[in-house]
């Protein structure tokens, strides 16, 4: 697919100029912004530009398939909301139907809503999880649920129980009338889709073109990662000492690969973290593909007594670790300077790669000496390239990367 390259490669700021408008606005504001945006594309090396356009086309196609679906996978894509029948969506676990709301109080704003499952529905077939974004809509009893025939509320799954399910509305309602009006109707829940996750991938690819040439050459495998054989361990990790030393001597990049259940997280991640914390004034980012893996990392940190801040949504984190969320910890800060101090003094940050990708401003406040990425073999390059290319003050925001993954595992 060369359409994107044919469009973007010759594109100039003047070609994007509106026919009407202030000359001063154009010359002093709009033109400089557009030229700064396009410059990394025009100034990139042929290899970097080819890499950029190849993955730009890949992400574009992935976004398209997320909307219209894949012919090889039945019921995929957001278009399944109106293309697939309710029975098909129930069979694939992509719909809750015949849900009845527990009516909230008549007065006051409605931020959460709880709905009961039908008695006959087999919930074990569902592929919904806490933290998933969903749509919620009513439909008349005796008819098939159809999101295109009624109003739709957007929400996030807060909790999934054995008899009921709780949602947090993305746009809280002013009162309960919207639910009491449909009290004789059933309600259905289906998966939602946000484009913001793809926006972060596009932003990350552009960050790759803006990265220092030395980091670009490393990511494109144009040079060997640097190693410092003079570095020695400060801690003792028993049988892990040999591997821990090799990881420490790697200056920029290390791959830790092994079969499932071999202790890559329990020993590899934890001991690498503990060794890095023995160095003064170092800061570490711990990432994984799924929130479940991040919960596991948080459990290891809690067991070791290591303080950390977690990036992400409270609904995606296990209840035991929500008190460590950045959004929770800042509630104790009375001033903006206290928030900055909290971020600067906390040495360990934890979150999914998606959460870190969604917070590019964090790297302007916080630079990391080490990033350890668990479940790395489940990730595709566009999920990582923005993180590995992030810069602050002209230098990589992450100095060293350790990727941990299962042997011969395909991306999720």
What are these regions (language model features)?
Residues 2-143:
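Accessory interdomain/linker segments of ATP-dependent helicases and helicase-like nucleic-acid enzymes
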Residues 2-33, 47, 120-249, 299, ...:
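Pre-ATPase regulatory/linker segments immediately N-terminal to the P-loop/RecA-like helicase/translocase core
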Residues 250-256, 281-282:
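Pre-Walker A (Motif I) flank of P-loop NTPase domains
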Residues 260, 350-352, 374:
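Hydrophobic beta-strand scaffold positions of dinucleotide-using enzymes
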Residues 260, 267, 272-302, 309-312:
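Conserved RecA-like ASCE P-loop NTPase motor core of nucleic-acid helicases/translocases
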Residues 279-282, 290, 340, 354-356, ...:
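Conserved helicase motor core of SF1/SF2 NTP-dependent helicases
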Residues 311-319, 352-358:
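Conserved helicase motor
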Residues 320-349:
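Conserved motor-coupling elements within RecA-like helicase/translocase cores
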């Amino acid at each position: 697919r060369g359409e994107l390259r044919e469009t973007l490669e010759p594109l100039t700021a003047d070609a994007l100029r509106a026919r009407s408008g202030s000359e001063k606005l154009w010359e002093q504001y709009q033109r400089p912004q557009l030229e700064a945006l396009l410059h990394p594309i025009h100034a990139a090396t042929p290899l970097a530009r080819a890499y950029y356009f190849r993955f730009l086309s890949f992400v574009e196609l992935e976004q398209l398939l997320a909307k219209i679906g894949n012919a090889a996978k039945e019921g995929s894509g957001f278009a399944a909301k109106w293309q697939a029948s309710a029975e098909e969506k129930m069979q694939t676990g992509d719909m809750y139907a015949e849900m009845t709301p527990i009516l909230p109080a008549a007065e006051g704003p409605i931020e959460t809503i709880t709905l009961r499952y039908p008695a006959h529905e087999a919930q074990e077939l569902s592929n919904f999880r806490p933290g998933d974004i969903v749509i919620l809509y009513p439909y008349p009893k005796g008819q098939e649920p159809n999101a295109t025939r009624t109003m739709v509320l957007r929400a996030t799954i807060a909790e999934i129980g054995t008899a009921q399910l709780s949602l947090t509305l993305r746009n809280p309602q002013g009162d309960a009338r919207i639910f009491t009006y449909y009290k004789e109707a059933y309600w259905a829940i289906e998966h939602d889709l946000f484009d913001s996750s793809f926006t972060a991938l596009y932003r990350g690819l552009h960050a790759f073109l803006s990265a220092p040439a030395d980091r670009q050459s490393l990511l494109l495998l144009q040079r060997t990662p640097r190693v410092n054989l003079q570095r020695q361990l400060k801690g003792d990790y028993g049988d892990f000492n040999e591997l821990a030393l090799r990881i420490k001597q790697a200056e920029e990049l290390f791959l830790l690969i092994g079969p499932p259940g071999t202790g890559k997280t329990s020993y590899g991640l934890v001991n690498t973290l503990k060794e890095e914390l023995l160095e003064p004034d170092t800061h570490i980012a711990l990432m994984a593909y799924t929130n479940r893996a991040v919960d596991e990392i948080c459990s290891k940190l809690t067991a070791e007594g290591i303080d950390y801040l977690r990036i992400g949504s409270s609904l995606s984190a296990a209840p035991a670790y929500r008190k460590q969320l950045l959004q929770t910890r800042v509630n104790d800060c009375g001033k903006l300077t206290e928030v900055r101090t909290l971020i600067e003094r906390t040495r360990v940050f934890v979150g999914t790669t998606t959460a870190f990708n969604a917070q590019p401003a964090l790297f302007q406040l916080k630079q990391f000496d080490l990033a350890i990425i668990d479940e790395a073999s489940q990730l595709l390059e566009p999920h990582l390239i923005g993180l590995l290319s992030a810069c602050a003050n002209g230098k990589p925001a992450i100095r060293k990367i350790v990727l941990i993954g299962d042997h011969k595992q395909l991306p999720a």
